[in-house]
UniProtKB/Swiss-Prot annotation:
It comes from Mesorhizobium japonicum (strain LMG 29417 / CECT 9101 / MAFF 303099) (Mesorhizobium loti (strain MAFF 303099)). Residues 75-145 are annotated as: Domain II. The lineage of its organism: Bacteria, Pseudomonadati, Pseudomonadota, Alphaproteobacteria, Hyphomicrobiales. Residues 369-490 are annotated as: Domain IV, binds dsDNA. It is found in: Cytoplasm. This is Chromosomal replication initiator protein DnaA. The keyword Nucleotide-binding applies.
Length: 490
């Protein structure tokens, strides 16, 4: 049903009021993608792109939206929040049922919470207790990825680039069995942006909320190791029984899951858990649709939930991370003093991932011990290996495709397809144009990255966008916005 211009105008005024009351950052996080879908007979339906946004807005902002709309239309009876594209992939075939599951021991349930900090990402199996039965050892070992006690919701720095993912993670951790689940919840971001922090915070908070809950946190590599070891030791059935009896499965670094048989077992596991209304949370360095090493049915199942991106932290978030890190360091050394001027400078200069920021702070701590009067110029010398002042950031075509697709609300698959509808052609041409002006890639190389197109197609797109932007101020502003987003988030 077409929406009247009157309803659109009312909606625009409501959005303006929302932004004024809540601030631009909160508005952008929760309401930036709202659209009025229908307005008739006192009922207004507002659409959002995900079930998570619908649930969050219903739970936190529906009364405010209704109040603001009633100021525009006293005849309003009801506001409904609906999902624009609520498609969900079902299972393609019934999976064979495993033998009845056995209950995991209390030791297994809480092995995570007692885990020590691991110096690296390669997990090692716990040392078996002398004299313990083989099956008991196996059950104890199933939760082999330890939690880092530093990774909690309280120590996570929230901001515009991760606010939605943070809210979803808290909702999952704090939900009861009857609560709305975002299932599976899929978090994706490049390295060092807080995925592992959020996943471990979910596990820790879930155990805190319900100590009897059965929580499994492990990396994809550890999952592969466990299954390979179980198959070698003829314990595969025992492992499957343990895993099917859990309440919350959390898998990190999904992009490393390799092997047809391992992927088959993983797909079978998440199908079983999801069909049993058990929560699954997964993280990777890219969206499910771009995990090309995964079998199509695994990608399909992961695509059936809520996928949320976490992007690079802004200045305020980086400064918050540094201040939190300093406060933690002062617990061990109360005399430690790093000025606000230095923290501000580092936050402005180190613009990459949280890991780079952590490395910069560790350098500061080390130098502070024998250079207490350290200067800004000296800091630039010390941190030269972390940042290069004036060095242009390298932008990848994949980053441009991802950010342009998100901006125009299309998928990367559509961007690379042969579809010729206007809603796809314009974003595709914009992405080709930006690939030409923001990367050193040749026209033939750009064409190959866009679904194997000929270089003349790319040249046509570049020239068309150049011509249009010269006469269309709106398009010129869009291109400038996209350039900033790409430079900030690539």
């Amino acid at each position: 049903m077409a929406v009247s211009s009157d309803a659109e105008q009312k909606f625009d005024r409501v959005k303006t009021q929302l932004k004024a009351r809540l601030g631009a950052e909160v508005y952008s996080s929760w309401f930036g993608r709202m659209k009025v879908a229908e307005a008739s007979k006192g009922i207004v339906r507002i659409s959002v792109p995900t079930a998570f946004l619908r649930s969050w807005i219903n739970g936190h902002y529906l009364d405010l939206i209704s109040e603001l709309w009633k100021q525009e239309d006293a005849d309003l009876l009801k506001i409904e929040i609906v999902v624009r594209t609520a498609t969900r992939q079902g299972r393609s075939h019934a999976e064979p049922e495993l033998a009845p599951a056995r209950k995991m021991t209390r030791q297994t349930q809480t092995a995570l919470a007692a885990g020590t900090v691991s110096p690296g990402r390669v997990e090692r199996p716990p040392v078996p207790r002398p004299g313990a039965a083989v099956e008991s050892e196996f059950r104890h070992n199933v939760l082999g990825s330890p939690l880092d006690p530093r990774y909690t919701f309280g120590s996570f720095i929230e901001g515009p680039s991760n606010r939605v993912a943070f809210a979803a993670a808290k909702a999952v951790a704090e939900s009861q069995s009857s609560a709305v689940r975002f299932n599976p919840l899929f978090l994706h971001a490049t390295v060092g942006l807080g995925k592992t922090h959020l996943l471990q915070a979910i596990a820790a908070e879930s155990l805190k909320q319900n100590p009897k809950s059965r929580v499994v946190y492990l990396t994809a590599e550890y999952f592969m190791w466990r299954f390979a070891t179980a198959i070698r030791d003829n314990n595969a059935l025992t492992l499957k029984e343990q895993l099917r009896d859990i309440d919350l499965l959390i898998i990190d670094d999904m992009q490393f899951l390799q092997g047809k048989s391992i992927q088959h077992e993983f797909c079978h596991l998440i199908n079983m858990l999801l069909d049993s209304a058990k929560q699954v949370v997964v993280a990777a360095d890219r969206p499910p649709s771009e995990l090309e090493s995964l079998e199509p049915r695994v990608r399909s199942r992961l695509n059936g939930g809520v996928a949320l991106e976490m992007s690079a932290p802004d200045f305020a978030m980086r400064l918050g991370m540094l201040k939190l890190r300093l406060a933690t360091a002062r617990i061990d050394d109360a005399s430690l003093d790093i000025s606000d001027e230095i923290l501000n400078h580092v936050a402005r200069t180190v613009t990459g991932s949280g890991r780079e920021l952590e490395g910069a702070f560790n350098q500061l701590l080390f130098r502070q011990s024998f250079e207490p009067q350290i200067t800004i110029d000296r800091i630039d010398e010390i941190l030269g290996h972390i940042y290069r002042t004036g060095e242009p950031k390298r932008v990848r075509i994949e980053d441009i495709q991802r950010i342009v697709a998100r901006h125009y609300n299309v998928s990367k698959t559509e961007l690379l397809s042969n579809r010729r509808t206007r809603t796809i052609v314009k974003p595709r041409q914009v992405a080709m144009y930006l690939s030409k002006v923001m990367t050193p890639r040749s026209l033939p190389e750009i064409g190959r990255r866009f679904g194997g197109r000929d270089h003349t197609t790319v040249l046509h797109a570049v020239r068309k966008i150049e011509d249009l932007s010269g006469n269309d101020n709106t398009l010129a502003q869009e291109l400038e916005l996209l350039r900033r987003l790409i430079n900030d988030q690539a």
